[in-house]
């Protein structure tokens, strides 16, 4: 029998699908990545084509194995990690989606959320799902599809439609429609899953008018869900053995498996998660209570704060303002000036996430004078990522009663040394950047590998988490608080803008 030397992580993100092949020492052997189309039918609406998601993801799997000359019988397992909340509804007979995937960033269901609040559902949803009533989560997206796509409601009532977050859709496609599952971490992001009972909440489903028959079976983040024969020569069936939403996968990849350990992922958005173990901590500060992975992939509780615009605000500097030609140049230009010259950028392009939860906030630049140049704006945009992270971390420490000794970081933007140092300064906390920054893929691979015995256990995995660099805080306290106070004033200027703007029209 061929020795199984590899685990593959499929990392299905907001802008690209990736496949990452890891060996037994958790070294990256091969990577393949494909971008796919972002669809913006109206202002504030964001969609993806589910067929394109599957096509790009399956082709990266084939390509990553092919590039490294790896046969499928050398792969012990596949782990999946995915953009969360993004909603796919498809017909189980035809296998075709009834509508495009509605992406987590999409704000089209703001009015549905207002209507549900008016019906008094907010506190029930908060207490039982751990989430706030916001367009971000899957529940109102499913309701929108059933209410607005011709024939969808009738097909759903007849038991012909299935719902899935992206993980569910990929597993269903990869198993030729045999397996309809999700894991606890993804289920906890739908606003339809009761995190106290660990079951779909039938009261919420009834209130949203969503049939239970559409919902996938919910399983641990580390177990064999099914087999796939996609990906490489040999045609061997590979177990799909790990699933976790991208942020929970990163938390696991950083080995934050004990209560009180936390990480921040700097991707399209920023996501700060703190593992709270078996204790469900309810936030009084606008954070979410969600499910994460315990040591063996079983459900554990976590606090989460989501910032909608992290790396996406750097893309805005590049693509819309044309101030930089490459995202990596932002560090060079930001360090050409000593300060932001009193400028604050609040990148609330799609509203504000935690701890504000203001769907009507909009992007704002304040403090402009004639002396401000493009470098100041670039610097202020980078600084906004660090300020938003502090907003969330302050709330998290207040809720949990735990003062973090260090923050573990990952995601594309952690390569930016200016941002990491500024982050340490703003937080007055050490920031630890790991050697392997692909921790989301690492988490999915670890979960899959553990399920099939590729790795023995947690101790073996914890030995692989090496730190590349620690950033220590430099700012004095007075300067830190003065700058942060300025940020808070800038946020006030951005809030509720769309409401006032609409009234004026």
Swiss-Prot record:
* InterPro entries noted in UniProt: ATPase_NBD (IPR043129), Carb_kinase_FGGY (IPR000577), Carb_kinase_FGGY_CS (IPR018483), FGGY_C (IPR018485), FGGY_N (IPR018484), Glycerol_kin (IPR005999)
Family statement:
Belongs to the FGGY kinase family.
Ways its activity is controlled: Inhibited by fructose 1,6-bisphosphate (FBP).
A GO cellular component annotated for this chain's UniProt record is:
cytosol
Give GO terms: molecular function aspect only.
ATP binding; glycerol kinase activity
This chain's protein is named Glycerol kinase
Which EC number applies?
2.7.1.30
Q: Print the keywords alphabetically.
A: ATP-binding, Glycerol metabolism, Kinase, Nucleotide-binding, Transferase
| Residues annotated for sn-glycerol 3-phosphate binding in this entry | 14, 84-85, 136, 246
Protein function: Key enzyme in the regulation of glycerol uptake and metabolism. Catalyzes the phosphorylation of glycerol to yield sn-glycerol 3-phosphate.
This enzyme catalyses: glycerol + ATP = sn-glycerol 3-phosphate + ADP + H(+)
Q: Which Gene3D superfamilies match?
A: 3.30.420.40
**Protein residues bound to glycerol:** 84-85, 136, 246-247
């Amino acid at each position: 029998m061929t020795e199984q030397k590899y685990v593959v992580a499929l990392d299905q993100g907001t802008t690209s699908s990736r496949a990452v092949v890891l060996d037994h020492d958790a070294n990256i052997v091969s990577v393949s990545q494909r971008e796919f189309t972002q669809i913006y039918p109206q202002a504030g609406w964001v969609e993806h084509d589910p067929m394109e998601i599957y096509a790009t993801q399956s082709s990266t799997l084939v390509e990553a194995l092919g590039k490294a000359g790896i046969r499928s019988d050398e792969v012990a397992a596949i782990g999946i990690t995915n953009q969360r909340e993004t909603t796919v509804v498809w017909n189980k007979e035809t296998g075709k989606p009834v509508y495009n995937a509605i992406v987590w960033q999409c704000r089209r269901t703001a009015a549905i959320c207002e209507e549900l609040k008016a019906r008094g559902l907010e506190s029930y949803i908060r207490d039982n799902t751990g989430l706030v009533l916001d367009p971000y989560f899957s529940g109102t997206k499913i309701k929108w599809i059933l209410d607005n796509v011709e024939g969808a409601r009738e097909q759903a009532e007849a038991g012909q439609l299935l719902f899935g977050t992206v993980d569910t859709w990929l597993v269903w496609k990869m198993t030729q429609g045999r397996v309809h599952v999700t894991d606890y971490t993804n289920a906890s992001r739908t606003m339809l899953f009761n995190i106290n009972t660990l079951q779909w909440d039938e009261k919420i489903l009834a209130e949203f008018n969503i049939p239970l028959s559409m919902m996938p079976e919910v399983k641990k983040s580390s177990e064999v869900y099914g087999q796939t024969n996609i990906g490489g020569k040999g045609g061997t069936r590979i177990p799909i053995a790990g699933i976790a939403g991208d942020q929970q996968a990163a938390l696991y990849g950083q080995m934050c498996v004990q209560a009180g350990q936390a990480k921040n992922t700097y991707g399209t958005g920023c996501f700060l998660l703190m593992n709270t173990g078996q204790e469900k901590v309810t936030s009084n500060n606008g954070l979410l209570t969600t499910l994460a992975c315990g040591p063996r992939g079983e459900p554990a509780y976590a606090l989460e704060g989501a910032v909608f615009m992290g790396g996406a605000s750097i893309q805005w500097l590049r693509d819309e303002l044309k101030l930089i030609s490459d995202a990596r140049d932002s560090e060079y230009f930001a360090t050409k000036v000593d300060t932001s010259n009193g400028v604050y950028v609040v990148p609330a392009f799609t509203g504000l996430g935690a701890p504000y939860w203001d769907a009507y906030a909009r992007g704002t630049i304040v403090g402009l004078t004639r002396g401000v140049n493009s470098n100041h704006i670039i610097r202020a945009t980078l600084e906004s990522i660090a300020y938003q992270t502090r907003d969330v971390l302050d709330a998290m420490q207040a809720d949990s009663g735990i003062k973090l000794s260090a923050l573990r970081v990952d995601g594309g933007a952690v390569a930016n040394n200016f941002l990491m140092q500024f982050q340490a300064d703003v937080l007055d906390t050490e920031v630890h950047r790991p050697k392997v920054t692909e921790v989301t893929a690492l988490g999915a691979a670890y979960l899959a590998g553990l399920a099939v015995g590729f790795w023995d256990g947690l101790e073996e995995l914890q030995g692989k988490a090496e730190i590349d660099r620690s950033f220590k805080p430099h700012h004095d306290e007075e300067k830190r608080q003065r700058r942060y106070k300025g940020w808070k004033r800038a946020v006030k200027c951005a809030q509720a803008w769309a409401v006032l703007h609409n009234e004026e029209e």
